[in-house]
């Protein structure tokens, strides 16, 4: 019985030595993961074994090769995903925004239609249209500012100013602090990004990258 027990222990030791010395890279990755998790326990209180496995798989990937192997369709999917994720983060109610915009555009189109049929309406009706026309245009501009790219472009300009005046490292520190200060949004976005990268779902990968950017944009409101 003791010999059997010693044999079992010997097998276990051989396995452990092989794991440490022959697969040193994998072991160091696992240890790094554990240290990272311990260090970021407050930030990631609900981290799972699947998250750890995704991180390990991503660390083994050659991301440069993945980028080089992306097809034109993959790049398009990534771009569409980034746009969708950014729109989702910057504007949390896109359907409501788009519906309001569509209603305003319909109203504007109706004004143009009525003016083009000027002789079919009375002078008083035309004067009324002229009076409300500036208001409709103003509402359109307001909605375009809220739903369109103007807000995004302005904030990209602010980030570019940080990089130009303070350097890339300062922007990286700013981005890290901005992301870490939003753990409620950061955790599910990070989890989705890891899963999308492992499965090579480029459109969803783009969505999560866009959500990351949205977190940065939303944190820059001062």
Swiss-Prot record:
Family, similarity comment: Belongs to the Sct family.
Region forming the signal peptide: 1-22
Protein name: Secreted protein D
Keywords (A to Z) from UniProt: Glycoprotein, Secreted, Signal
Glycosylation sites: 25
Gene Ontology cellular-component terms listed: extracellular region
Compartments (UniProt record): Secreted
Main subcellular location: secreted
């Amino acid at each position: 019985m003791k010999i059997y027990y010693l044999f079992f222990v010997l097998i276990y030791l051989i396995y452990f030595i092989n794991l440490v010395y022959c697969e040193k890279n994998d072991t160091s990755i696992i240890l790094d993961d554990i240290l990272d998790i311990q260090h970021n326990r407050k930030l990631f209180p609900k981290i799972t074994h699947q998250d750890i496995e995704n991180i390990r798989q991503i660390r083994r990937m050659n991301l440069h090769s993945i980028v080089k192997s992306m097809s034109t369709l993959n790049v398009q999917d990534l771009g569409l995903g980034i746009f969708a994720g950014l729109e989702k983060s910057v504007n949390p109610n896109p359907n409501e925004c788009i519906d309001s915009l569509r209603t305003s555009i319909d109203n504007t189109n109706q004004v143009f239609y009525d003016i083009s049929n000027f002789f079919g309406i009375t002078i008083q009706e035309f004067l009324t249209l002229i009076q409300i026309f500036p208001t409709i245009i103003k509402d359109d501009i307001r909605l375009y500012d809220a739903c369109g790219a103007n807000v995004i472009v302005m904030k990209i300009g602010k980030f570019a100013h940080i990089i130009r005046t303070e350097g890339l490292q300062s922007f990286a520190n700013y981005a890290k602090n901005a992301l870490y200060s939003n753990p409620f949004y950061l955790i599910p976005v990070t989890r989705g990004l890891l899963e999308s990268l492992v499965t090579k779902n480029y459109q969803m990968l783009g969505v999560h990258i866009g959500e990351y950017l949205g977190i940065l944009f939303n944190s820059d409101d001062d």
